């Protein structure tokens, strides 16, 4: 049987949605609130329902062979600081829970993706900078 993987919400999320805890999924941003990793945080990389552990990006442990591996943390030691509401059913669940306490929840606007034009311009600027450096290096080599 799988464990219910609910994690407490941060104070501002509690106030915003009127709920204390919510199931954690990949993509949520969490913070460790107790234990040896207290204060560390990051995006949830994996939720293992069988073992009841949550793996967070950036929190690793060294294996015997020297490689780094994800460190499983118990959900009761975590706090959600940012919810991933990209899945529609998840937002609907929050909305229904908030309605019980007469809290109206507005659907958050999705974060804007960087435009391809901007990224192409940035790429061209980088290429020009590299080309200028090469010409400077070539000029210095010719002088020496």
From Swiss-Prot:
Alphabetized Pfam families for the sequence: Ribosomal_L26 (PF16906)
SUPFAM superfamilies: Translation proteins SH3-like domain (SSF50104)
Biased composition range(s): Acidic residues: 135-144
Region (Disordered), start-end ranges: 102-144
Biased segments, Basic and acidic residues type: 103-134
Keyword set, alphabetical order: Ribonucleoprotein, Ribosomal protein, RNA-binding, rRNA-binding
Cellular component GO terms, alphabetical: large ribosomal subunit
Record GO terms (molecular function): rRNA binding; structural constituent of ribosome
Cited SMART domains: KOW (SM00739)
Domain of life from the UniProt record: Archaea
Oligomer and partners: Part of the 50S ribosomal subunit.
Free-text function comment from the UniProt entry: One of two assembly initiator proteins, it binds directly to the 5'-end of the 23S rRNA, where it nucleates assembly of the 50S subunit. Located at the polypeptide exit tunnel on the outside of the subunit.
Family classification: Belongs to the universal ribosomal protein uL24 family.
Protein name: Large ribosomal subunit protein uL24
Gene that specifies this protein: rpl24
């Amino acid at each position: 049987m799988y464990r219910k993987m609910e994690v407490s919400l941060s104070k501002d999320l509690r106030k915003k949605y009127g709920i204390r805890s919510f199931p954690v999924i990949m993509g949520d941003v969490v913070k460790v609130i107790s234990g040896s990793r207290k204060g560390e945080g990051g995006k949830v990389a994996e939720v293992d329902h069988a073992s009841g552990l949550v793996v967070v990006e950036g929190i690793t442990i060294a294996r015997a062979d020297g490689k780094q591996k994800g460190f499983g943390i118990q959900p009761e030691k975590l706090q959600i600081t940012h919810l991933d509401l990209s899945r529609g059913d998840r937002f609907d669940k929050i909305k229904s829970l908030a309605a019980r306490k007469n809290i109206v929840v507005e659907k958050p606007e999705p974060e804007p993706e960087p435009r391809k034009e901007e990224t192409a311009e940035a790429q061209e600027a980088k290429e020009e900078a590299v080309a200028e450096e090469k010409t400077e290096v070539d000029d210095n080599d010719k002088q020496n």
